[in-house]
């Protein structure tokens, strides 16, 4: 197992949410999860969703909570179907437990840099997410972008693939960000010193007809529709 996946054992996962979403994303990457990342996720996630590189399940857990009873009115429960994909089975197991929807949740241990066997089932989803995943994958921007093609068979024709990643090039990091970048890359958790937004956008445009992106702070947010 790669170090970036091995790091997330059952104990470390509990600290992940606080460190990443309350400290690193705010002070290091200037792309706060609460005001940017979570609204971005919520606006694109569909009833049938595949979450790739799920980590602790922060994003699907948040959407699940928001779909429950609020202000005395019942909202349709999310999800209809949820597939949690990660290289580390600890991540998918913990995320599935936290989401709390066992009847409609499945888990899959897979490497997105390789063709995903489950694609042979021809099940497709309304949405696929890669939130804070690409900067953890080993290799160049071009090799990481193979993940888009591997995930494309899972997406409905009218579905959306979306995600976010911390950039190494094309942005100016502050001192704290540079420190976290150095430490994370030295430990093999990140592999993003060479990651430029244009590389990912070009790769997405090869697999999808409609691609949108924006850089917030040091983070690339992207959406891709109409798989070709």
UniProtKB/Swiss-Prot annotation:
Q: What class of enzyme is it?
A: transferase
User: What biological-process GO terms show up in the record?
Assistant: methylation; terpenoid biosynthetic process
What EC number(s) does this enzyme carry? 2.1.1.-
Question: Is-annotated flag, keyword Protein biosynthesis?
Answer: no
Pathway listed:
Secondary metabolite biosynthesis; terpenoid biosynthesis; Mycotoxin biosynthesis
SUPFAM superfamilies on file: S-adenosyl-L-methionine-dependent methyltransferases
Q: What's a single GO MF annotation on this record?
A: methyltransferase activity
For this UniProt record, the keywords arranged alphabetically read as follows: Methyltransferase, Transferase
- Which family is this sequence assigned to? Belongs to the methyltransferase superfamily.
Q: What is this protein called?
A: Methyltransferase verB
């Amino acid at each position: 197992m790669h170090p970036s996946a091995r790091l997330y054992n059952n104990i470390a996962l509990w600290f992940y949410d606080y460190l990443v979403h309350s400290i690193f994303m705010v002070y290091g990457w200037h792309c706060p999860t609460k005001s940017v990342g979570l609204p971005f996720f919520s606006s694109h996630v569909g009833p049938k969703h595949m979450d790739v590189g799920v980590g602790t399940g922060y994003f699907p857990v948040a959407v699940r909570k928001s779909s429950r009873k609020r202000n005395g009115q019942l909202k349709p429960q999310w999800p209809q179907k949820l597939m949690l994909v990660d290289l580390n089975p600890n991540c998918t197991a913990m995320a599935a437990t936290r989401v709390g929807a066992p009847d409609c949740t499945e888990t899959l241990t897979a490497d997105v840099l390789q063709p995903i066997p489950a694609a042979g089932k021809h099940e497709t989803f309304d949405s696929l997410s890669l939130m804070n995943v690409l900067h953890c994958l080993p290799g160049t921007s071009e090799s990481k972008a193979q993940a888009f093609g591997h995930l494309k068979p899972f997406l409905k024709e009218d579905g959306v693939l979306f995600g976010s990643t911390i950039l190494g090039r094309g942005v100016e990091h502050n001192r704290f960000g540079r420190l976290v970048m150095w430490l994370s890359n030295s430990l093999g958790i990140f592999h993003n010193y060479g990651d430029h937004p244009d590389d990912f956008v070009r790769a997405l445009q090869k697999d999808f007809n409609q691609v949108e992106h924006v850089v917030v702070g040091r983070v690339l947010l992207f959406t891709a529709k109409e798989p070709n």
